[in-house]
Swiss-Prot record:
GO terms for cellular component: cytosol. This is Lysine--tRNA ligase. Homodimer. The keyword Ubl conjugation does not apply. It comes from Pseudomonas paraeruginosa (strain DSM 24068 / PA7). Mg(2+) 1 binds at residues 411, 418. It catalyses: tRNA(Lys) + L-lysine + ATP = L-lysyl-tRNA(Lys) + AMP + diphosphate. Its EC number is 6.1.1.6. Disulfide bonds: none annotated. The keyword Transcription does not apply. NCBIfam families: lysS_bact (TIGR00499), PRK00484.1 (NF001756).
């Protein structure tokens, strides 16, 4: 047994010993009272609200007012006379007043452990150091914690364990709690932003008979009653556009997508997307709307349009750079010439040398995108709208009027990561049918991410869809930016993990 394994074994033995002691204490609680886990305590205040409401009250003013409160929380520290509690908003001390609390209660308090949850009544007071606390007149145990909290000096530092046991991570790490509060704020602000502009929030199917709306490999399942294969959705796009056909001219959805692909710091098989569509608009309108949304989000969450991330600062207050795929390759790779990009064989050689997975049947447009992904994408630090994607890789986007080889599409990159994807929607049913057929050929040639042919969607387009612009924004990656989080797992409450051995 290695030293590391020995240390781990000793730690496990110590934890088992502590758990056994706590179970003995719980057994004593069960014996002493009829209900070991009571549910009749009602608090009337959160700690953060108390701190804010009485911030300007002096020690003398609080003594004179004798403000009664009922609070509840988890024991995070026990300093003898003072116990530090934590609720969902903040931490606050409660004072173990030996002059007013019954002897029986004082004896019970001595048996409580870190992690136990208690309910306390008392009056607000302020210490000589200026700290607000509750001078307890009564207190009782509400929940006995059977497992010890992580060591107070080291906390829960193992990253993988933080992801596996997020409930413990949330207990002991304020930074984690802050991240998920921000996530909630971001989603609430997006809803408000779009609703104020006339967008209708909708819900579309998570189980689909044909996976569509993105180039990705789906999860497949089986519907027993209908005896048919079904797929977890990879995107809601085709259903949202059906709604535009039906007359809902501004719609959005914030929900989960599922893609049966790799796991990394940027990818999780289950992730949250915002998708929105507006009729009588194009992709340039969406660029303007996206800039406005991102500035408002940064200001609302950070109080500034400058967004710190790692050792960089992204400037959301400045106009986002707008550059085509083609021009971005030339700008960031001066060794590549227009002649290289316009020749299939030369482009294929560049893509292969750059590390792209070249199969050999790709057209020029797809090769250019491969080169972009390998040689440009990671260099796009400040916000960039990359536009005019080749039509081969944009089966749902409208062709550009001036150059039909490209589409009216953009992807937004910040910090070298794709954050959003948008385009003027293809509303020509015949063109869409042809592109679906091209995707079917790609799939037959071995591309697992190529799209299926969706006959019902073609049927919908044949009724007529107005000129429309649509966009998808990755909520998880956006929250990563706004919380300075290096991994997508830091912003997903329960990320997917391999089973423990």
């Amino acid at each position: 047994m290695s030293d590391q394994q020995l240390d781990q074994h000793e730690l496990q033995q110590e934890e088992n010993k502590l758990i056994a002691q706590r179970k003995e204490k719980l057994a004593a609680v069960r014996e002493a009272r009829a209900i070991a886990f009571p549910n009749d305590f009602r608090r009337d205040a959160y700690f953060a609200d108390l701190q804010k409401q009485y911030a300007d009250k002096t020690k003398e003013e609080l003594e004179a007012a004798a403000i009664p409160v009922k609070v509840a929380g988890r024991i995070m520290l026990n300093r003898g006379s003072f116990i530090v509690l934590q609720d969902s908003s903040e931490r606050l001390q409660v004072y173990v007043n030996r002059k007013t609390l019954p002897e029986e209660t004082l004896a019970e308090i001595k048996t409580w452990d870190l992690g136990d949850i208690i309910g306390a009544e008392g009056v607000l007071a302020r210490s000589g150091k200026g700290d607000l606390y509750v001078d307890m007149t009564s207190v009782r145990l509400l929940t006995k914690s059977l497992r010890p909290l992580p060591d107070k000096h080291h906390g829960l530092t193992d990253t993988e364990q933080r992801y596996r046991q997020r409930y413990v991570d949330l207990m002991v790490n304020e930074e984690t709690r802050h991240t998920f509060r921000v996530r909630s704020q971001v989603i609430a602000h997006i809803r408000r932003f779009l609703s104020e502009r006339g967008f209708l929030e909708v819900e579309t199917p998570m189980l689909q008979t044909i996976p569509g709306g993105a180039a990705a490999k789906p999860f497949e399942t089986h519907h027993n009653a209908l005896d048919m294969a079904m797929f977890l959705r990879i995107a809601p796009e085709l259903y949202l556009k059906r709604l535009v056909v039906g007359g809902f001219e501004k719609v959005f959805e914030i929900n989960r997508n599922f893609r049966n692909e790799g796991v990394s710091t940027r990818h999780n098989p289950e992730f949250t997307m915002l998708e929105f569509y507006q009729a009588y608009a194009d992709y340039e309108d969406n660029m303007d709307l996206t800039e406005e949304l991102f500035r408002e989000l940064a200001q609302a969450v950070l109080g500034s349009t400058d967004v710190p991330y790692g050792d960089k600062v992204f400037h959301f207050g400045e106009p986002f750079v707008r550059l085509s795929v083609y021009d971005s390759i030339l700008k960031y790779n001066p060794q590549i010439t227009p002649a290289d990009l316009n020749d299939v064989e030369k482009a294929r050689a560049i893509a292969r040398k750059a590390g792209a997975k070249v199969l050999g049947h790709e057209g020029l447009g797809k090769l250019q995108v491969m080169i972009f992904e390998e040689l440009v994408e990671h260099k796009l630090e400040q916000p960039h709208f990359i536009t005019r994607y080749p039509f081969e890789v944009s089966p749902l986007a409208r062709r550009n009027d001036e150059d039909p080889s490209v589409t009216d599409r953009f992807e937004l990159f910040i910090g070298g990561r794709e954050i959003a994807n948008a385009y003027s929607e293809l509303n020509d049913a015949e063109d869409q049918a042809e592109r679906f057929m091209l995707q079917v050929k790609e799939k037959d040639a071995g591309d697992d991410e190529a799209m299926h042919y969706d006959a019902d969607f073609i049927n919908a387009l044949e009724y007529g869809m107005p000129p429309t612009a649509g966009e998808g924004i990755g909520i998880d990656r956006l929250v990563m930016l706004l919380t300075n989080s290096p991994s997508i797992r830091d912003v997903i409450l329960f990320p997917h993990m391999r089973p423990q051995a």
